[in-house]
Amino acid sequence: MNVILLDKIANLGNLGDQVSVKAGYARNFLLPQGKAVVANTANTEVFEARRADLEAKLAADLAAATQRAEKISALESVVIASKAGDEGKLFGSIGNRDIADAVTAAGVELAKSEVRLPLGAIRTTGEFEVEVQVHTEVKAIVKLSVVAEA
């Protein structure tokens, strides 16, 4: 099924690209979320009329994401206290949700889906640098300090 993208979508394309996707992906995700329209002549004309508005919205989203990334990078080390054994091994682990909650408590809104932990959850005490992807083009680094609870 051919669709015209109304938003930038990772691993698929940018605004205005006409791409071929599987029918189920289009019907169940792209079309209901408003991220694409079916590629036909009527929709192409409507899209070209709305193109400037959509590009302005995309630029505004990128600017807002850049500001959030600067705020996140400007944060001092975010401290998370967790129960730990004698050798610094945590009882449990610290995952995306815990990091997102700690950053939000520090004053910058962050969703758990934006936190990237490629090596999995954190299981020891210490200092860590966690990558946060606030936009498809914008990344930031959060300094995280995991300490043992007293």
UniProtKB/Swiss-Prot annotation:
NCBIfam families: L9. GO terms for molecular function: rRNA binding; structural constituent of ribosome. The keyword Metal-binding does not apply. The keyword Ribonucleoprotein applies. Disulfide bonds: none annotated. It holds the Pfam family Ribosomal_L9_N. One of its GO terms (biological process) is translation. Keywords: Ribonucleoprotein, Ribosomal protein, RNA-binding, rRNA-binding. It comes from Shewanella pealeana (strain ATCC 700345 / ANG-SQ1). It comes from the Bacteria. GO terms for cellular component: ribonucleoprotein complex; ribosome. This is Large ribosomal subunit protein bL9. Binds to the 23S rRNA. Belongs to the bacterial ribosomal protein bL9 family.
